């Protein structure tokens, strides 16, 4: 639980302003007795309390915030910006420049932050085969024609992902996301242990299928959960997250040059993201669309 305390020396107009519910980063409702509760905003818990000592024409106001962010995985990046936004109230109803155009509630914030974390894994799985298959070809002693065929074969996984996207409509986004992450990480590790180019190629087909499945379901999930005015913003942030994951492959690529076999180490990196699977399954609710479909069929 985070705490923030601000002391104001205000005139009557300033007191009226600070005593009204906020409608910027957070939307409040007046709970009475100088307390304001959360209507909408990126918080699991939120309360604003005013303590007022008045004199003729002047008011000493102690404003206290108690809150807990509903931003998993990336919450530490937003601690200071959110404290700054709470300290500097906006009366025009707009959010800070770094926030989405629409107000995101606890559910949407939690879902979107988790999807961004999954996008890191998706970006890594997408770029790892492209950046390392030449190193694998050198170790397995295959020619350039075989490398080209390998690259074409791997991309079959993108087509296979269509079937898994259909399964997500029937069995839920959350479940298929979990399976796709699990298979992507497992077969990335199997690719690292491949004894031949054929097994390596087969593993990468599964990795590509898992990654494409993640990409499709993440986009659909985000579009279903984000407000209409924030969907373009959301897709842009998901793209940035995936690019960061892809960049991780490039940053670690020098490892592949240490020895003929050292490219394999890059494919073990997704093991570090295993906690993401359990966290995503625990924190992600099912999408509203699937939830409504289940309710109708019940």
Task: Locate each region found by the language model.
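Cytoplasmic helix-loop-helix junction between adjacent transmembrane helices
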Residues: 203-240
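Structural signature of the two symmetry-related core transmembrane helices
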Residues: 175-190
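Central cavity-lining transmembrane alpha-helices of secondary-active solute carriers
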Residues: 151-166, 215, 219
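Extracytoplasmic
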Residues: 111-144
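Helix-breaking motifs and short loop linkers at transmembrane-helix boundaries and internal kinks
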Residues: 141, 172, 193-198, 210, ...
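Symmetry-related core transmembrane helices of the 12-TM Major Facilitator Superfamily/SLC fold
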Residues: 263-282
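Helix-loop junctions at membrane interfaces in 12-TM secondary transporters
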Residues: 192-203, 259-260
